[in-house]
Regions:
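Glycine-rich phosphate-binding loop of ATP-dependent small-molecule kinases
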Residues: 1-324
Length: 324
């Protein structure tokens, strides 16, 4: 029987563009309608933001011990831009663990996470950083982060389904470049760097749902949503200003769409192959999604209808490339 739902959707946009809000919206749509109207099955969700949060938490604990930070120099962009690839490799690993329902049973979830960070970074060309910490430092920060790391691991395992029938894996991430940068972006900036870092198994099945906002609008929304009491939340975390301007001052998705070899796709050269990844664009330049951060019972019907139309326009365009 033909499966009429996307297997993998890359949900991509600048931070605070509405990605998590759209994901939250889809979680509250009846499964049958989600499939029939949007070609999206029950969501299995992967997101690199929890890893960004834990990178910052590791650095915070290192700083408390008067040790050098390894990921960020403070409220600023990565020390090593190749860590955008580290994040992609972590998502690749999460994808493989999901598909194989791999269950890890470590004595220390934090130390397992440290090892995963080093392994993913090695795949992006970065030498070990956490594995070379002295034993006392490593043990101390592992103890301080164990509760958070264990919760992440438990949540990951809890997301494994009994079956993948009528399921869609939603992989959420944000990429960009410096404010005012010329196109094409180069180096480790933008989707031009990160998309080829995804594994073949993802790229072969992926469709991109891109949420389009202007940098000015996303900066406004970032300030509106930021809750200092909930920095690890998908819906309420904020991005530091230096990062907004240095890493997310612009993005290159519009450029990649315009220069793709095939219309309504993004051309990705990776793993010795060329992938033409279909893309649909949700135009959120005039904010349609901020209300979705509230409780569902407060969602106004006319605003829900606007979101329905915008998502359906994007997913219908994506589905025009679908082969089952």
């Amino acid at each position: 029987m033909k499966n009429n739902v996307f297997k993998v959707v890359l949900l991509q946009a600048l931070p605070a563009s509405g990605k998590s809000e759209v994901r939250n919206f889809m979680a509250h749509v009846e499964p049958e309608r989600l499939q029939n109207e949007f070609h999206i099955g029950e969501n299995l969700q992967l997101d690199d933001f929890p890893y960004v949060h834990m990178m910052r938490r590791i650095d915070e604990e290192l700083a408390k011990l008067d040790k050098p930070r390894v990921f960020y120099p403070g409220e600023a962009p990565f020390l090593d831009g190749r860590d955008w690839g580290t994040l992609c490799n972590l998502l690749n690993e999460d994808y493989h663990d999901l598909m194989n329902r791999n269950i890890a049973k470590p004595d220390s979830a934090a130390k397992l996470l440290f090892d995963r960070f080093d392994r993913a970074a090695a795949g992006a060309g970065i030498p070990n950083r956490l594995g070379v910490l002295d034993e006392n430092t490593r043990n101390t920060i592992a103890e301080r982060l164990e509760k958070e790391a264990r919760a992440m691991l438990d949540e990951k395992h809890a997301g494994y389904p009994e079956s993948f029938e009528n399921k869609t894996i939603i992989i959420e991430c944000a990429r960009g470049g410096p404010d005012g940068a010329a196109m094409p972006l180069t180096g480790t900036f933008g989707y031009q760097y990160s998309l080829p870092m995804f594994c073949p198994e993802i790229l072969e099945q992926a469709f991109i749902l891109y949420i389009w906002v202007t940098p000015e609008e996303y900066r406004r929304k970032n300030a509106d949503r930021a809750d200092p009491n909930d920095p690890g939340s998908n819906l309420h975390h904020g991005v530091p200003m230096a990062v907004m301007l240095g890493d997310y001052g612009c993005d290159d998705m519009e450029y990649l769409i315009k220069t793709s070899e095939v219309e309504n796709t993004v051309t990705v050269n990776a793993h010795g192959k060329t992938y033409h990844v279909p893309i649909g664009v949700f135009d959120n330049r005039v904010d349609k999604t901020s209300f979705l951060r509230g409780e569902p019972e407060t969602w106004a019907a006319d605003k829900v209808a606007d979101v329905n139309r915008a998502i359906r326009t994007a997913t219908d365009n994506m589905f025009s490339h679908y082969n089952g």
